[in-house]
């Protein structure tokens, strides 16, 4: 029902048809917009708890930017929202409730509006990393939070940005596989081992 409703809503928006003529279900609260109802269903229904949270906002938002487009690209690759937030915004501020709120305002969440500068850097890192790491590994927060911590601590952020891009490009496939295939041991968690390997090779 949720998917069917989204398809109908998208068709109405693309054809420029009046949304008041679209009937998905008979609402108990007629004051709730259909697009908002669909988004609420996506977020509150466990079946749709994965990557579908951005579909309805993407149809409703009037104007986007590079950060939003990057976030949508990652969403299509089934990245979780928390990881998308770090890649696209440089923080963990992008929340599902903000995307639902954007349906009412038809504006992007504030953290995406302010993220173009970060996104210009992180997209370069992502593209370089994608040549060596799998999407499954990049969908976890290990790499982007490691990069972000280094960026925040850098004396020269511009130099760090370029250096990290080069380091990612120069990473051998053997090194990348060693990092992304790391497993926990009796003395270290998987995260600790991955972070140690990232420090060693990047």
Which role fits each region the language model picked out?
Residues 1-202:
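Accessory terminal alpha-helical modules
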